[in-house]
UniProtKB/Swiss-Prot annotation:
Changing D116A: Abolishes mRNA cap-binding. This is Nuclear cap-binding protein subunit 2. The modification Omega-N-methylarginine is found at R146. GO terms for biological process: alternative mRNA splicing, via spliceosome; cap-dependent translational initiation; histone mRNA metabolic process; miRNA-mediated post-transcriptional gene silencing; mRNA 3'-end processing; mRNA cis splicing, via spliceosome; mRNA export from nucleus; mRNA metabolic process. GO terms for cellular component: ciliary basal body; cytoplasm; cytosol; nuclear cap binding complex; nucleoplasm; nucleus; RNA cap binding complex. It comes from Homo sapiens (Human). Changing R112 to A/T: Does not affect mRNA cap-binding. The modification N-acetylserine is found at S2. Residues 134-144 have a biased composition (Basic and acidic residues). Changing Y20F: Strongly impairs mRNA cap-binding. The modification Phosphoserine is found at S13, S18. Keywords: Acetylation, Cytoplasm, Methylation, mRNA processing, mRNA splicing, mRNA transport, Nonsense-mediated mRNA decay, Nucleus, Phosphoprotein, RNA-binding, RNA-mediated gene silencing, Translation regulation, Transport. The lineage of its organism: Eukaryota, Metazoa, Chordata, Craniata, Vertebrata. The gene is NCBP2. Changing N46A: Does not affect mRNA cap-binding. It holds the Pfam family RRM_1.
Amino acid sequence: MSGGLLKALRSDSYVELSQYRDQHFRGDNEEQEKLLKKSCTLYVGNLSFYTTEEQIYELFSKSGDIKKIIMGLDKMKKTACGFCFVEYYSRADAENAMRYINGTRLDDRIIRTDWDAGFKEGRQYGRGRSGGQVRDEYRQDYDAGRGGYGKLAQNQ
């Protein structure tokens, strides 16, 4: 085995952390990064509003045993709003999901996964002003899988 591969296997994670950091994280960047490197929880984005928890389970369980799935909800309507959290029992299973599921298609949408520092109650709700995700507030195009036009475009 090459030295680089051995080093990668011994590291906290050889699935790279993205540049994204949760702006609402309570703590400093160093603490958040430390949690991200140990986390077994993934954020899953760009889901259709119609994707079910069962579909998430079916896809993500191919990478390992799932401890919990938390569907993202519109904080006003309590309906799905295009994201979820998937928590695995082991870091290795979460890494497999990052490696093999990120960028795949589910419900005709390319989904993206990212490390999450760990689910906390309240994070299942969208952070946009209208209750959904912020990105859906400003979207100008029509997207049937995400509720039609963005909220601002609907109000024009």
